Amino acid sequence: MPELPEVEVTRQGIAPHLVEQTVVDLVIRNASLRWPVPELAKQIIGQTIRQVRRRAKYLLIDTDAGTSIVHLGMSGSLRILPHDTPVEKHDHIDLVLANGRILRFNDPRRFGAWLWCQLPEEAHPLLEKLGPEPLTDAFNVNQLAAALAGKKKAIKLCLMDNHIVVGVGNIYANEALFAAGIHPEAEAGKIDIERLTVLVAEVKQILAHAIKQGGTTLKDFTNAEGKPGYFAQKLHVYGRGGETCTQCGNLLSEIRLGQRTTVFCGICQTR
């Protein structure tokens, strides 16, 4: 599943091709995505795209009339292509531009979304209760400590809770906890301020580095140019259960936590 770095890499890839371009059509071949594509989505036709933003793992394509809210789901991708590019399987939506280019949405599993919002997007039900962006100053040790106070849940589950901080999915939660030396099952409310300070710094550093490297290469993710990301070459724990720890040589443990695969080092990561 594309996580925050992959979505940000996609935003960076498509934005230069979309901003200040006029939309001449929205071709919907299959409206049966995670939520049905609303007919209102076609209100973007005739509009000029003002900016392309990201909120959590949602891409926001802004016009004066409203905002297209796009989610890549489990396997979705967005590509900038010439308008006459042949349609392939799972090419569900084309945003057609006046300059002869298209933004094509491909989603084999159809867990993605293409919605329309005329309200201030912060008021949309999918966005209104989201926590702070991890790469902004709003995500800091004081905010995290307050959000975790009294919580008995495992820290990894809290780190993946979009009400606490957005965009820290399974891959990067595993990696950040390893880098911070914190056991993923540690009780969130009992982690002291010093360790939380390290954790916040590692979340920011790991996400920023993943964006710089182009996102994580998993079987489904390619960027807006169809190229894979490269961060998977640098993963320390995710997907490496049973292999040796890169720091101490101990075998990495693999468990299920919140129905997600969790990998950690029982020596380097403590409760």
From Swiss-Prot:
Organism: Shewanella sp. (strain ANA-3)
A Pfam family: Fapy_DNA_glyco
UniProt name for this protein: Formamidopyrimidine-DNA glycosylase
Described purpose of this protein according to its UniProt entry: Involved in base excision repair of DNA damaged by oxidation or by mutagenic agents. Acts as a DNA glycosylase that recognizes and removes damaged bases. Has a preference for oxidized purines, such as 7,8-dihydro-8-oxoguanine (8-oxoG). Has AP (apurinic/apyrimidinic) lyase activity and introduces nicks in the DNA strand. Cleaves the DNA backbone by beta-delta elimination to generate a single-strand break at the site of the removed base with both 3'- and 5'-phosphates.
Record's subunit section: Monomer.
GO molecular function, one term: class I DNA-(apurinic or apyrimidinic site) endonuclease activity
NCBIfam families to which the protein is assigned, alphabetical: fpg, PRK01103.1
Residues annotated for DNA binding in this entry: H90, R109, K151
Top-level taxon of the source organism: Bacteria
Record InterPro entries: DNA_glyclase/AP_lyase_DNA-bd, DNA_glyclase_Znf_dom_DNA_BS, Formamido-pyr_DNA_Glyclase, FPG_cat, MutM-like_N-ter, Ribosomal_uS13-like_H2TH, Znf_DNA_glyclase/AP_lyase, Znf_FPG/IleRS
SMART domains assigned to the protein according to its UniProt record, in alphabetical order: Fapy_DNA_glyco, H2TH
Ranges annotated as FPG-type zinc finger: 236-270
